[in-house]
């Protein structure tokens, strides 16, 4: 993977990371179009590890929300109570991804480069988003995130382990299925991305090192490629993250997912 390919793929990942589309799915499609060997071990690692840039974007832009929860501002809770509730719910929502991610790791790895599967999932996801607002938004009036709701959303998030399925779409729909408002569901999805993507990145790095693939990081320009991808990703990813809590997913945005789904499906189905 050369530097031009790295830059293009990183920009695509940054632009799609915080939208209800599959950033990984779009990356795989673009990698295929650019002639990148998507079965290559380093490319698979790059596809996951580059999302570390998204983590940095969220933490840098919303660090106050991580250290000064909204409930403190509104006076609903004391500082330490609000901090405990915020992180405890994130932990509960992350547990399913940890358990199922480890259990189905082989399936995820073997299908990460499956362009046909990715294409189909993008198409199905795009079509589903056209109707999910009508299906789940009726009666959505809750803003309180209970531990039970956090756990259910965490399990629904695991559907995104299928390459081409959007993590943010899964969690937002999961929240709305629990009668949370779109805003409340999107906010939890936004913050849940941090521990989830951080865990996925750590797992990928661990697998590379423990299976003797750690040398891949220092092979040729691989390490520089990872650094370049993460840095390039920061700008578009940061722009998306900056408006993430203010321009929450709505029906007009679904067009982006449908477009991506059709694009990916047409390409994938011909391979």
What are the residue ranges of the model-derived segments?
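Multi-pass membrane proteins that catalyze or facilitate reactions on polyprenyl-/lipid-phosphate substrates
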Residues: 1-271
């Amino acid at each position: 993977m050369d530097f031009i390919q790295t830059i293009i793929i990183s920009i695509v990942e940054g632009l799609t990371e915080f939208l209800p589309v599959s950033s990984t799915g779009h990356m795989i499609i673009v990698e295929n179009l650019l002639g990148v060997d998507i079965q290559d071990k380093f490319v698979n690692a790059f596809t996951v590890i580059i999302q570390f840039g998204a983590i940095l974007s969220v933490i840098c832009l919303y660090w106050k929300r991580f250290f000064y929860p909204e409930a403190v501002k509104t006076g609903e809770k004391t500082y330490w109570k609000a901090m405990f509730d915020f992180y405890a719910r994130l932990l509960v929502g992350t547990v399913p991804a940890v358990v199922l991610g480890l259990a189905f790791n082989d399936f995820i790895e073997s299908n990460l480069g499956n362009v046909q599967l990715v294409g189909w999932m993008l198409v199905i996801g795009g079509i589903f988003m056209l109707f999910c607002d009508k299906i789940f938004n009726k009666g959505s009036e809750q803003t309180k995130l209970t531990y039970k709701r956090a756990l259910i959303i965490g399990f629904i998030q695991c559907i995104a382990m299928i390459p081409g399925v959007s993590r943010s779409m899964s969690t937002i729909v999961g929240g709305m299925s629990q009668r949370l408002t779109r805003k409340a569901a999107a906010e939890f999805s936004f913050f849940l991305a941090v521990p989830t993507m951080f865990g996925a990145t750590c797992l990928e790095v661990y697998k590379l090192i423990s299976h003797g693939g750690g040398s891949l990081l220092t092979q040729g320009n691989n390490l520089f490629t990872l650094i370049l991808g993460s840095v390039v990703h920061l700008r578009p990813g940061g722009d998306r993250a900056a408006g993430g809590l203010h321009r929450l997913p709505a029906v007009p945005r679904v067009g982006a997912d449908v477009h991506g789904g059709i694009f990916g499906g047409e390409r994938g189905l011909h391979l």
